[in-house]
Amino acid sequence: MDLKKLSGSELLIELEKLNCDLAIPWKIEDEKLSKTFKFKNFMQAFAFMTQSALYAEKKNHHPEWFNIYNKVVIQLTTHDVAGISFKDFDLAKKMESFIPHF
């Protein structure tokens, strides 16, 4: 995977691909790929974070996130390129793949 900061047009293309089938879209906020997930309860939110953390550790690409009861707020950025890269979109896609399990 090419590690580079995505250009404005690349961001729009990747964001459109990521969001094409999602009821609640990801957004670009403060130069980060962002989304808030809402679950039925804290246990589901924490289980989602655990699955996501295991994948993030495997890829050595860690999210900025926080949890408040049943909500998980996520911001993805690649510090090595000072912006959003394909690694952020890969992690976002993987996180979305965990959602049907909840």
Curated annotation (Swiss-Prot):
Keywords: Lyase. The keyword Lyase applies. This is Putative pterin-4-alpha-carbinolamine dehydratase. PANTHER family: PTERIN-4-ALPHA-CARBINOLAMINE DEHYDRATASE. One of its GO terms (molecular function) is 4-alpha-hydroxytetrahydrobiopterin dehydratase activity. Its EC number is 4.2.1.96. Coiled coil: none annotated. GO terms for biological process: tetrahydrobiopterin biosynthetic process. It catalyses: (4aS,6R)-4a-hydroxy-L-erythro-5,6,7,8-tetrahydrobiopterin = (6R)-L-erythro-6,7-dihydrobiopterin + H2O. Disulfide bonds: none annotated. Belongs to the pterin-4-alpha-carbinolamine dehydratase family. HAMAP family: Pterin_4_alpha.
